[in-house]
Amino acid sequence: MRKIIHIDMDCYFAAVEMRDFPEFKGKPLAVGGRSDRRGVISTCNYEARKFGVRSAMSSHKALQLCPDLVLVPGRMDVYKSVSAQIRSVFARYTDIIEPLSLDEAYLDVTDSPHCKGSATLMAKAIREEIFELTGLTASAGIAPIKFLAKIASDLNKPNGQYLITPERIPAFVKDLPLIKIPGVGKVTAAKLEALGLLNCQDVQQYPKDKLIHAFGKFGVVLIDRAHGIDPRALSMDRLRKSVGVETTLAQDIYSLEQCHQILPGLIQELGSRCAKSAKQRQIHKQVVKLKFSDFKQTTIEHRSDELNINLFYELLSQALARSQGRGIRLLGVSVGLSDNQVNEHAPSFYGAQLDLGL
């Protein structure tokens, strides 16, 4: 039986700011963009959460909920540096590490000799070492499988840990709300609820063929998770699935012509980012994303095995047709990446200056 630890730093960006600027301690604090520039909250501390402030909320709304909110810009270089320190602690206990972001990771400690092989004691030791090294607290989940370890890390926050032993899995998943399963978002949860499926026990009792028919491959995954099954090994060399760039606009725009003024710069930046992080990867789709003035968003995508500049313009037109008169506050473009490498003879936009004269 495997021993998986999921480490999740507590309100990471905000915690770094409170550490570096002690005057922020005890005050509601958020890291994000300025409200007068239509910024969005990246992370907030627990004091801010008491007022209803949440990640991905507009800074304007956050300040409405909490007028005394201290809003600071992010310092990504600092967050990356501290993240490297945190990962150095992980490496003392295992070399099987799957980073998920700057502030969370899976660790497989099945064969680790530390703490007499106890995953619970290792999680505690890791959290203590992180605090000694960085002054930041972390929470941990311990379980035999990945998705339960991730769920468990959220059950005793902040600065705590939670263990799900193998024999507890059937009882634990029985009443587990489906929305708690990684990969089940609000839209999927609503579709499941429409079928009368609210928790894992509901899925266990639902006809498998109907679930697979309704959700395809994800239906198979959902059935596994509902039965406490997750055979996935840790992915130590996680390949990016996509590369994208987006911009939040200072003022809402409404016309296709206005969008066309912004799109070339986004495409150029997309090419630059791909050159840095996905130079040898083959693309398999192009995507345009719009977020409207009511904060609802839409995405349009199309299969493509090489970058087609004109396709972004076509997708933008299709997306804008869904605006129903609403203003556009955010515009983004991205490409989906396959696991395959680019053929050396295939046309590529990576690293090149794009000719955007259409």
UniProtKB/Swiss-Prot annotation:
Q: Which reaction does it catalyse?
A: DNA(n) + a 2'-deoxyribonucleoside 5'-triphosphate = DNA(n+1) + diphosphate
Swiss-Prot/TrEMBL keywords: Cytoplasm, DNA damage, DNA repair, DNA replication, DNA-binding, DNA-directed DNA polymerase, Magnesium, Metal-binding, Mutator protein, Nucleotidyltransferase, Transferase
> Its Gene Ontology molecular function terms?
damaged DNA binding; DNA-directed DNA polymerase activity; magnesium ion binding
Membrane-traversing stretches: none
Family the UniProt entry places it in: Belongs to the DNA polymerase type-Y family.
This chain belongs to the protein called DNA polymerase IV
PROSITE patterns referenced in this protein's UniProt entry, alphabetically: UMUC
Q: Which Pfam families match?
A: IMS (PF00817), IMS_C (PF11799), IMS_HHH_1 (PF21999)
User: What is its subcellular localisation?
Assistant: Cytoplasm
Q: What is the lineage of its organism?
A: Bacteria, Pseudomonadati, Pseudomonadota, Gammaproteobacteria, Alteromonadales
Site positions for Substrate discrimination: F13
The record, for InterPro entries, names: DNA/RNA_pol_sf, DNA_pol_Y-fam_lit_finger_sf, DNA_pol_Y-fam_little_finger, DNA_polymerase-Y, DNApol_IV, IMS_HHH_1, Rev_trsase/Diguanyl_cyclase, UmuC
Q: Which example biological process does GO assign this protein?
A: DNA-templated DNA replication
Which cofactors does it use? Mg(2+)
Q: How does it assemble?
A: Monomer.
Q: Where is the UmuC domain?
A: 4-185
- Encoding gene, per UniProt annotation: dinB
**Catalytic residues?**
E104
